[in-house]
Amino acid sequence: MGAGRRAAALGKKVAMIENRVIGGTCVNVGCVPKKVMLNLASYLEEASLFKDYGVNGTEGLKLDFPAFKERRDAYVKRLNGIYSNNIAK
């Protein structure tokens, strides 16, 4: 996608083909969703250490997975919109 945008910026004609949602595997089901989940796991791990520094109330944190999934999917959808907007330029 980056190469296509650069070529278009240099005046070349470009055709981009996407058989699914714009952004490809990385944005939609690979790198991005995985990193969002990894970040959440890191946050939960960090929160489990807060009590060692005198922060109370972080014991027994529970993940509301449907709410998390909704937020993760909204983030991916936002990226799809950014890609669509960039292509339209």
Regions found by a protein language model. Give the residues of each.
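Residues forming the Rossmann-fold NAD(P)(H) cofactor-binding site
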Residues: 1
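Glycine-rich flavin
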Residues: 5-12, 17-89
